[in-house]
């Protein structure tokens, strides 16, 4: 949670009934680190027991529409005040120093970037999103910060004073990483992956048949169009760094 005069930490997650095994563990790992978790329940008949907590604010698709995974960011358009916002997923286990570490990196960029763990670089010209995306996977180690075209919304942080948007204006659902990247680039906000050890974040489950990436592999035509739109926009310059990187990481020469 927040300390002293620092910004509140707020997280957003979207989940669906098929994640009933992993979502409670993901929530358990992130909840102690934030003041509030906005939890978007996609097509639930009832609020599950694991969502009943004083620091969890439930948003239901029956009340807010068919936003699917986009719902993790819905609170930005509601009553979230100034904060550091963390996008998290229902199938990722977050380490105890997760929020503190990402906040530290935001501070080193003066809060003018969005930072994250899972990222991607697009090779231009983009002819296929699935083929032309180089993934910097969250489980892989990185020795130095890297500016990227996309950040995975499962492991992203930013200050609401720098970036705020309304997912209800996004034309697509379940294309969160690309839609987030476009929102950031249109506002000239750079995206940066942070240094970390291997498996600093760990997956609670992978390769689910109903995952967003599985859908991309079946048909990436719409994602390709969005990726082409993204690379056509100039990548914003990185701001000047304020201080050295945390001792936990070794920066590459």
Write out the residue ranges for each language-model feature.
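Conserved catalytic core of nucleotide-sugar-dependent glycosyltransferases
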Residues: 93-167
């Amino acid at each position: 949670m927040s300390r002293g005069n620092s910004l509140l930490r707020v997280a957003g997650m979207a989940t669906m009934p098929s994640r009933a095994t992993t979502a409670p563990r993901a929530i358990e790992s992130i909840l102690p680190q934030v003041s509030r978790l906005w939890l978007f329940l996609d097509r639930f008949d009832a609020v599950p027991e694991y969502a009943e907590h004083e620091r969890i604010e439930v948003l239901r698709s029956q009340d807010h529409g068919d936003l699917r995974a986009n719902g993790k960011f819905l609170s930005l358009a509601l009553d979230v005040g100034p904060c550091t916002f963390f996008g998290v997923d229902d199938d990722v286990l977050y380490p105890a120093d997760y929020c503190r570490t990402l906040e530290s990196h935001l501070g080193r960029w003066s809060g003018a970037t969005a930072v994250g763990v899972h990222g991607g670089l697009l090779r231009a010209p983009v002819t296929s999103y699935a083929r032309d995306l180089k993934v910097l996977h969250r489980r892989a180690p990185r020795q130095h910060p890297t500016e990227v075209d996309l950040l995975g919304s499962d492991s992203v942080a930013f200050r609401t004073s720098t970036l705020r948007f309304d997912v209800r204006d996004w034309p697509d659902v379940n294309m969160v990483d690309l839609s987030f990247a476009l929102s950031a680039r249109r506002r000239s906000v750079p995206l940066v992956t942070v240094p970390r050890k291997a498996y600093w974040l760990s997956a609670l489950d992978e390769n689910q048949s109903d995952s967003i990436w599985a859908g991309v592999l079946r048909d990436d035509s719409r994602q390709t169009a969005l990726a082409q739109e993204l690379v056509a926009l100039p990548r914003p310059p990185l701001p000047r760094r304020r201080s050295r990187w945390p001792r936990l990481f070794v920066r590459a020469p």
